[in-house]
Amino acid sequence: MDSVKKSWCIVLAVCLLAGLAGCAEHQEMPTETQAVITTEETTAPTATSAETEATEVTEATVVTEPVILEEPEPVAEYISEGVLITLDGVDVTEQLAEADYDRAIPIYSSQKLTIESETPFAALYIIWKNHPGIFTLQWDGGSLECGAEGFLHDYIQLPEVVRSVSFAFESEEDYAVMQLGAYTYGTAPEGVQDWLPPCETADILAFPTHSDDDVLFFGGVISYYAIEEELTVQTAFMTDHRYEPFRNHERLNGLWEMGVRHYPIVGTARDFYTMSLQEAANYHGYDPILEWQVQQIRRFKPLVIIGHDPEGEYGHGQHQLNTYCLVQAVEMAADARDYPWIALQYGLWDTPKLYLHLYEENPIIFDVNTVLINDPAGRTPYEIAQDAYVCHVSQAGYFEVSQNPNSVMDCTRFGLYRTLVGYDTGGDLMEHTARGE
């Protein structure tokens, strides 16, 4: 009996072990990933709705769209070979290769000026002797009207790449070209002036009398604010040098060197040397100058205006007349009773600050000897003004840029003639103004 019981016990044990083994064979073991998920699902607390929203926000901020960086526009290259310029079929390529301010090729409205190039081009650089009228560039399948701005130095980007362009002149006035060149597609290279139109509103509006006064007296100030602070500097010249057209080119070259990019405004007063304010007033009159100045002030709405020494620096009567009228024009520009027809076009403007060169009250000494970070050549405002004056070839030997405190040519000394925003505490002409806005 005992042996039978033992046998049954052995059989039952074997069966039990076999069953357990079978169960083990059919049970699927979780993978490592499944094990982790299972653990998280069993241990993590249930998220609230707020936590869910926060998670969604976090996830949304992490997911970003790919950023596509636009390649900068290339710098255009001058095409020096394989170019042919003809005027009514006559080759004038060599004459127009480089500007000579003492000569130009006259062109009548009935004539045809054409530029062709073996290398496709997308821009033209033109230097005119005098301000041109309207003209049209024409090529196979397209055209572009130009000349509305009247730029003497004009960089024109074409809407497509071409190999040949002809000029069609709109007016009966005579044209005269000093330089014409073709360029590949891109922004204007160094040495090519791509002027912007006169600005909408100016941070600084300077009122020099002649071409070169902007450099001699205001050059350090203009260079600093135009280059280092990248402010909008607009210039308005009282005289037009109608009998010395080369000085108009010198003016553009000097302004460009000082970092000015908005095309200058030029008045209609003739350049005429006078020895006193009264002599200048007898020649020009007061009202034409006042009206012109009020127009510029209301148009450009400057934060700061810069004018000549009331004594005319070295006694030039036109300098004196310019400033004598300017201090009145600043007041008139804010008064609706003065020149109301100009107010209808531009509105009124009360200029926050007016500085005059060498004015002794509320004096300021402007720093022209600090190297400008934004100047590629690492120059100071004084050095830039000196380089700009080199552009005034016709005036070489007469004057020079100076910071001699005992000289009437000193470009560092100014006085705050009028202010609506308080007096200066440092050497910054733009102090207390909303510069760059």
Regions found by a protein language model. Give the residues of each.
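C-terminal motif of bacterial Sec signal peptides marking the signal peptidase cleavage site
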Residues: 19-22
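N-terminal intrinsically disordered, low-complexity tails enriched in polar/charged
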Residues: 4, 66-82
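The feature marks non-catalytic terminal segments
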Residues: 75-106, 117, 128-130, 135, ...
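Active-site beta-strand->loop->alpha-helix modules in alpha/beta enzyme cores, enriched
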Residues: 79-87, 91-113, 119-123, 128-134, ...
